[in-house]
Regions:
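A well-structured
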Residues: 2-171
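Contiguous, non-catalytic segments that form substrate-binding/exosite surfaces or channel walls
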Residues: 114-256
Length: 257
């Protein structure tokens, strides 16, 4: 049986996902176990993978595969009664085209600069956090903001820079809608915060081991499968997927807090 265009697109996407999972694995290690002196080489690794991923996500080959799969789907639609299947595939095509158009507008040099700035910025942020000195991180932060604004300009002029950068996480989100949603909170939160600040401070002296055990028990209550989920510690908690059956969560615990 001849390979379909949809299958060819799937094979291409699988390779891209494998590269993305390698990128995520490096990021996980950077946050949870990498020695400080490994930061420079890690920056090179992450920058290289970001470059390769951008090339794949903006390539003519990717564009042709999407279009061929779209045409093939149109042929199937004319001869199929399974509209749910068709709608599902049409949505996939729509999202892939959106991703392709976004990537195609980006300058490869900017993609590399951003990847390098994020990696170096994370290193400086850790140092600034340890020393409680924001000035250490400030120049890296300013560089990241400048690059992000340029990224937004290259992608689209339809939204503000913030709205453009938010689209992969919150599609169609606008500042107008966001302001409307948060206005009630802006009206009520100040009084709540003042009340909290006036209340009696409660100190619960938990050892690191007790905090770790508490986090583990909570995850078990939520139904954690220990064959699928690994928990680590990082300066800032996050979750990340490294593969179809590999999910990582981090927490941050401090002695006496």
């Amino acid at each position: 049986m001849a390979e379909t265009h949809w299958n060819k697109l799937g094979a291409y996407l699988k390779e891209t996902q494998i590269l993305g999972s390698i990128q995520n694995t490096l990021y996980w290690d950077q946050n949870t176990g990498m020695p400080k002196k490994g930061a420079s080489w890690r920056s090179e690794q992450l920058t290289y993978i970001a470059k390769v991923l951008h090339e794949r996500n903006s390539s003519e080959e990717f564009s042709n595969l999407i279009q061929s799969a779209k045409n093939e789907l149109a042929d199937i639609e004319r001869n199929s009664d399974n509209q749910l299947f068709i709608k599902d595939k049409e949505r996939n095509i729509s999202l892939l085209l959106k991703e392709f158009n976004r990537e195609r507008n980006l300058d490869p040099k900017l993609v590399e600069s951003l990847a390098k700035a994020k990696s170096k910025g994370y290193e400086s942020w850790q140092e600034a956090k340890e020393k409680s000195d924001f000035k250490i991180f400030l120049p890296f932060f300013e560089e990241l903001v400048k690059l992000r604004i340029e990224e937004a300009k290259q992608i689209s002029d339809q939204y503000s820079p913030w709205e453009t950068l938010a689209q992969p996480f919150e599609p169609e989100l606008t500042l107008k809608w966001l302001n409307k949603m948060f206005q009630p909170l802006k009206d009520t939160l100040p009084e709540l915060i003042r009340g909290i600040n006036k209340s009696k401070k409660y100190h619960w002296d938990l050892s690191l081991e007790s905090q770790h055990n508490l986090c583990s028990q909570l995850l078990d209550e939520f139904g954690r499968d220990k064959d699928l989920v690994v928990v680590g510690k990082s300066p800032h908690p996050f979750s990340i997927t490294l593969g179809p059956n590999d999910y990582r969560i981090t927490t941050r615990i401090v002695e006496g807090e």
